């Protein structure tokens, strides 16, 4: 089954201000009927990047069986981590980045990899606040 997950995260006073995430999951069943699920949550102290990660995690963790998943995000941080193979490099270096610095948000990256594991996931960057209905809805939820 193909599931499309649209995500967005936001934080005010970044870092350590209030924030939240939103995600919209869509799939079409065998009868051709569209199903939509919305997920969102807020936090008192967080960062924008943590909320971007949580949006993807929440979407993937909501799936109850292995799926083909297309993730649509305006976060280059999340999309490039997979499409430019940053995560592969971090894993090889023991969760270190260039100059041997620790990867930020490693707790959420590990959780995302675990949630992603049983699915065939592709990541797509979309321009934020550009009128794409699902992503605009995610921004509202966040």
Short names for language-model regions:
Residues 1-50, 54, 61-67, 82, ...:
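RNase H-like nuclease fold core
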Residues 10-16, 57-141:
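RNase H catalytic domain
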């Amino acid at each position: 089954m193909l599931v499309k997950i649209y995500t967005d995260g936001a934080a005010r006073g970044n870092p350590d201000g209030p924030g939240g995430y939103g995600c919209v999951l869509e799939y079409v069943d065998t009868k051709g009927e569209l199903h939509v699920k919305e997920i969102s949550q807020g936090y008192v102290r967080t960062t924008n990047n943590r909320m971007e990660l949580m949006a993807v995690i929440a979407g993937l963790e909501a799936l109850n069986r292995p799926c083909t998943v297309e993730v649509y995000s305006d976060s280059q941080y999340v999309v490039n981590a997979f499409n430019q193979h940053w995560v592969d490099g971090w894993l090889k270096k023991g969760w270190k980045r260039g100059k041997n610095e620790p990867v930020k948000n490693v707790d959420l990256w590990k959780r995302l990899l675990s949630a992603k594991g049983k699915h065939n996931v592709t990541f797509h960057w979309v321009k934020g606040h550009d009128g794409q209905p699902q992503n605009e809805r995610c921004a509202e939820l966040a």
